[in-house]
């Protein structure tokens, strides 16, 4: 934009240049610095700086994330961890000697929950945590639960 078209050029010849007669563009009309964040500048802070005011909880020093790592898997999805080639073999035999060993930890799951039904085939489940209902259902089909660290 050429200088001759700017607003400051258009204000030339007018004493206050659009800045008013009394205050004359002096002092601090909105307060100094970040004043009025909860009062007359509230809309700006709410829109552009949410969470600026208010309390924040305590930090957890030396938090070991692994203590809270517990992805869950339900019983109805447990057989998806068995290889598809071997799955048909296990389901047809259904003998306790040839029970599949499902290591949930190796597949990235920390806890077994009891939603769903299991096929009537014994299975050995290795997990860090198992819910009471899941353990009952696994035992009901002749399976075993092994807790691993």
Swiss-Prot record:
It is found in: Cytoplasm. Its main location: cytoplasm. One of its GO terms (cellular component) is nucleus. GO terms for biological process: translation. The keyword RNA-binding does not apply. Residues 1-13, 21-42 have a biased composition (Basic residues). It holds the Pfam family Ribosomal_L27A. It comes from the Eukaryota. GO terms for molecular function: RNA binding; structural constituent of ribosome. The keyword 4Fe-4S does not apply. Keywords: Cytoplasm, Ribonucleoprotein, Ribosomal protein. SUPFAM superfamilies: Ribosomal proteins L15p and L18e. Residues 1-44 are annotated as: Disordered. InterPro entries: Ribosomal_uL15, Ribosomal_uL15/eL18, Ribosomal_uL15/eL18_sf, Ribosomal_uL15_CS. Component of the large ribosomal subunit. Mature ribosomes consist of a small (40S) and a large (60S) subunit. The 40S subunit contains about 32 different proteins and 1 molecule of RNA (18S). The 60S subunit contains 45 different proteins and 3 molecules of RNA (25S, 5.8S and 5S). Component of the ribosome, a large ribonucleoprotein complex responsible for the synthesis of proteins in the cell. The small ribosomal subunit (SSU) binds messenger RNAs (mRNAs) and translates the encoded message by selecting cognate aminoacyl-transfer RNA (tRNA) molecules. The large subunit (LSU) contains the ribosomal catalytic site termed the peptidyl transferase center (PTC), which catalyzes the formation of peptide bonds, thereby polymerizing the amino acids delivered by tRNAs into a polypeptide chain. Belongs to the universal ribosomal protein uL15 family. This is Large ribosomal subunit protein uL15. It comes from Candida albicans (strain SC5314 / ATCC MYA-2876) (Yeast). The lineage of its organism: Eukaryota, Fungi, Dikarya, Ascomycota, Saccharomycotina.
């Amino acid at each position: 934009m050429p200088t001759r078209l700017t607003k400051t050029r258009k204000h030339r010849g007018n004493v206050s240049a659009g800045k008013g007669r009394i205050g004359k563009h002096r002092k601090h009309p909105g307060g100094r610095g970040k004043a009025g964040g909860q009062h007359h500048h509230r809309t700006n802070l709410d829109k552009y700086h949410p969470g600026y005011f208010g309390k924040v909880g305590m930090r957890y020093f030396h938090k070991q994330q692994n203590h809270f790592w517990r992805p869950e898997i339900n019983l109805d999805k447990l057989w998806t961890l068995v290889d598809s080639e071997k799955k048909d073999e296990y389901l047809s035999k259904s003998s306790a000697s040839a029970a599949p060993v499902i290591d949930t930890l190796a597949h990235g799951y920390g806890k077994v929950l009891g939603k769903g039904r299991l096929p009537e085939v014994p299975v050995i489940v290795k997990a860090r945590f198992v819910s009471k209902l899941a353990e009952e259902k696994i035992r009901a089909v002749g399976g075993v639960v092994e807790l691993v660290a």
